[in-house]
Amino acid sequence: MEVLCQAPAGNSNFACNPKFTAIRTRAISSNDTFKVISSTGNNKKMKGAIRTSIPKPSALPLKVSQLSPSADSMPVPASLQDVEAGKLIENNPSGGDTEELFQYLVEILASRVYDVAIDSPLQNAAKLSKKLGVNFWIKREDMQSVFSFKLRGAYNMMTKLSKEQLERGVITASAGNHAQGVALGAQRLKCTATIVMPVTTPEIKIEAVKNLDGKVVLHGDTFDKAQEHALKLAEDEGLTFIPPFDHPDVIIGQGTIGTEINRQLKDIHAVFVPVGGGGLIAGVAAYFKRVAPHTKIIGVEPFGASSMTQSLYHGERVKLEQVDNFADGVAVALVGEETFRLCKDLIDGMVLVSNDAISAAVKDVYDEGRNILETSGALAIAGAEAYCKYYNIKGENVVAIASGANMDFSKLKLVVDLADIGGQREALLATFMPEEPGSFKKFCELVGPMNITEFKYRYNSGRKQALVLYSVGVNTKSDLESMLERMKSSQLNTVNLTNNNLVKEHLRHLMGGRSEPSNEIFCQFIFPEKPGALRKFLDAFSPRWNISLFHYREQGELDASVLVGFQVPKGEIEEFRVQANNLGYSYEIESLNEASQLIME
């Protein structure tokens, strides 16, 4: 709960916020142009030294601005919220340059990744296969020694360095799986590895790097500042910077996963790949489209972190102004230059999924073999499930890459809360019933055979009706529909809130007797997880606006969702908006949210 820690008094540092040899990619230079997608609709071309991905904390769905797509962009609605989960957003690839793909293939086959990586198993998921009616296969990259595929790309690039470069050492900036991959590679090659991490990095991840003999440098309270410092150290000390995805040698290392899948299974309908910066899918596609072009290569992203989908749609790299960090391993604001070029030429399309679906996929893998994936590690499985359901795929071989298992233990509770809803095994409902004797018994009789998994009620004096917030286990859709019909026939107004994120994240934890403060508005803010975040928030608003509610919910390692109630007179709403915008935290006014009106008013 770093977000609730106060900074020392007087601390004002609250900052938030085609020959093969010719395709070597560097950090983005001041001449690179890309598009910025802003939630405010202020979309613009940018030039600047932005290197890899620097997400702005947000747990809210991405709001996509209305931009005119290029002639060769994908036929997708301007708002990705209109795209159904599982629907393939087609890419119409050109196929790429044959000679270049051959050179990628040769390099992939010659890679030395097996000095550190295992040939990970491709396991049949019997329960998922039966449920979906397909042959569902999971590529178990979570079984690598560092519990992630990232060691492949990092090590492959490091094996290409000269003796002099290795003697000087390597450096990177990461608080995740890439850090361990670089540290392990350096240990194997007997060179020093410096890993720059934000000061807010959990101790368990710091120790994981130290256990691999990596030198940890803690700098800055954001990834942006950590990477800036790493690049400066690389220049000052002559170290080689190992990027997480945007380099051909990194892409080649990740591409070795493709060779293994193709050797382990034939006649594959589609391979589903989690997408962050694009290194993994670019490598897998570079291999498959040369040796088995009939196999579909489909990327999977969360709705709130759709940088590759947006980039393919607009025909150029797009930098997202807001990124949902729920699946923090793929929370990338700007995809790589080389990875985007390859994906544009090679992959068949993208699928988007919700955080609920990702959580359900974590549970599905646990049910299969008692293994727990991290959220980004289960992303491709969620996408493959959604795709098979949407298109009613039957009898085909479907492969999903389980990319990692470095789950932050504190995040498990949130995943558990969302898993049954995401798997359509639970429905979240609100029912109004008379505040009179016998109502509770009648309610239970109407629920009937449905299993109540959560129930919250509080007596409200002075009101004729009480609101009950509850969850029920769902075996079939018809069972739920029958129960809702029974409620309706008995004149008990019932609302299905299963898909309401505000309820799932906050309001289900806030049931109680109602109060009626005047001029109350509700806002959901995304706080960066760092000391001083709360103080900065409190300093941003006029003290004349009373805070009437405050509920904090951790979302991951980088940010937290906070629901706040303010008492703001109607004539001062515009002033409130100005101060909220100046704060620099992502936010949304939730007063018009259906659930907010039902539960809080």
From Swiss-Prot:
CDD domains: ACT_ThrD-I_2 (cd04907), Thr-dehyd (cd01562). Gene3D superfamilies: 3.40.50.1100, Biosynthetic Threonine Deaminase, Domain 3 (3.40.1020.10). Keywords: Amino-acid biosynthesis, Branched-chain amino acid biosynthesis, Chloroplast, Isoleucine biosynthesis, Lyase, Plant defense, Plastid, Pyridoxal phosphate, Repeat, Transit peptide. It comes from the Eukaryota. It holds the Pfam family PALP. Its cofactor is pyridoxal 5'-phosphate. It is found in: Plastid, Chloroplast. GO terms for biological process: defense response; isoleucine biosynthetic process; L-serine catabolic process; threonine catabolic process. Disulfide bonds: none annotated. InterPro entries: ACT-like_dom_sf, Ser/Thr_Dehydratase, Ser/Thr_deHydtase_PyrdxlP-BS, TD_ACT-like, TD_ACT-like_sf, Thr_deHydtase_biosynth, TrpB-like_PALP, TrpB-like_PALP_sf. GO terms for molecular function: L-serine ammonia-lyase activity; pyridoxal phosphate binding; threonine deaminase activity. It catalyses: L-threonine = 2-oxobutanoate + NH4(+). GO terms for cellular component: chloroplast. Pathway: Amino-acid biosynthesis; L-isoleucine biosynthesis; 2-oxobutanoate from L-threonine: step 1/1. Its EC number is 4.3.1.19. Residues 1-51 form a transit peptide. Signal peptide: none annotated. Catalyzes the conversion of threonine to alpha-keto butyrate in isoleucine (Ile) biosynthesis. Required for JA-Ile biosynthesis, a signaling molecule involved in defense and resistance to the herbivore Manduca sexta caterpillars. Plants silencing TD exhibit a stunt growth phenotype. Belongs to the serine/threonine dehydratase family. This is Threonine dehydratase. It comes from Nicotiana attenuata. The gene is TD.
